[in-house]
Amino acid sequence: MSTKYVEVGELKEGSYVVIDGEPCRVVEIEKSKTGKHGSAKARIVAIGVFDGGKRTLSLPVDAQIEVPIIEKFTAQVLSISGNVIQLMDMRDYKTIEVPIDYVEEEAKGRLAPGVEVEVWQILNRYKITRVK
């Protein structure tokens, strides 16, 4: 798993974190100081990249949180069969299979064999983000 750790206080909306083993995009972050001697806390609301589930997390601002390293690359669609899309990685020409559920909605209608797409690799899973 390719991840790194950052402090919760460094996170911004739009950044990515790992919550319960699932990569998520932060949609809301709220920081508040609890009292005179309490440490500041952060409340994070994030949406799962692959499952679309909403997750909430509350941590101290100085705590470490796992952040996924997202690798973006270009691939070519080889075939679409049932619920699986077969891609060829344009860097090393290896074949990748991606479930149709891991395709962004706006890209689903434009997929066809021979089309080049942008693929994100997050925690050894693949997601088609857009058609080039």
Curated annotation (Swiss-Prot):
GO biological process: positive regulation of translational elongation; positive regulation of translational termination
Entry's Gene Ontology molecular function annotations: ribosome binding; RNA binding; translation elongation factor activity; translation initiation factor activity
Cross-referenced SMART domains: eIF-5a (SM01376)
Keyword tRNA-binding: no
Record-listed Hypusine modification sites: K36
InterPro entries: IF5A-like, IF5A-like_N, NA-bd_OB-fold, Rib_uL2_dom2, Trans_elong_IF5A_hypusine_site, Transl_elong_IF5A_arc, Transl_elong_IF5A_C, Translation_prot_SH3-like_sf
GO CC list: cytoplasm
Biological function: Functions by promoting the formation of the first peptide bond.
NCBIfam families listed in its UniProt record: eIF_5A, PRK03999.1
HAMAP family per UniProt: eIF_5A
Protein name: Translation initiation factor 5A
Source organism of the structure: Pyrobaculum islandicum (strain DSM 4184 / JCM 9189 / GEO3)
Source organism phylogeny: Archaea, Thermoproteota, Thermoprotei, Thermoproteales, Thermoproteaceae
